[in-house]
Amino acid sequence: CVMRREKKIEIRVCKTKDNRFTVDDFAALADERTRIIVMSTLEWCNGWASDMKAIGDFCQEKGIFLVVDAVQQLGVTKIDTKECHFDLLVAGGHKWLNSPYGTGVLYVNKNSLSKIKQSYAGYLNTTVPEGGWGAYWENPAAPSVHDWTFPETARKYEIGGTSNYTGAIALGESLGLVNEIGIENIQEHIWELSAYCMDQLEAIGATIITHRDPGRRGGIVIARLYDDLDVDRWVLKQLHARKIFIAQRFTDYVGGFRISCQYFNNHADIDAMAA
């Protein structure tokens, strides 16, 4: 690991127990030297949605930074950044927000802004000069070297150079659609559909890895059909040939078939997959 090798940072990995994390698992690894917990709000290889409020409360009590990747949850279920005491939340837009690659969002807690330095400087993340950038570039006396300052907002963490404007427009439209449908409506639909998916998979003999706990899952359902990985790969190819696109995902031997139940999917889609 680069951070471990070059920055001399000790990294402790929290392993799942019965395909889940709890706040106690993280607490058992933390001590007075722990500075930051970095984790996914919803795991990509087993579908587990952690109790982020409990973990956030623990981090706030111990003075530990909490940084989360919400790429598998944003656009699926509600996330309360303040209630969970997130210092940073990041998420790509290309998954459950159905946006182009190279798009995403960053949330930074206001109380954390002064503690996190930006990595680079560019005209899009520095303080806008008087009159705006257009007037600045048109000024013959504009210096080539300037003592730039940064705004005390999350904008100072922008890349600084040319932005992905077309991708941002698409991301904005996608977020607008999510808000139009309502995240509560999406959440209820996906919870019901993912439960139906698990029922149908169990009916054909699959082993379900994802937990059924209410509130502890999103749209990801992980299942295994056979003990032979090559046979499962053959099944995957047959589904793809029928234009039914699921995936196989593993990490540390945890995983299986990954079925993503989106807000635009329905029971007929699940029935076609399980047929």
Protein language model regions, located:
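PLP-dependent enzyme catalytic core of the Aspartate aminotransferase-like
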Residues: 28, 227-237, 241-275
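Structural signature of PLP-dependent enzymes
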Residues: 146-199
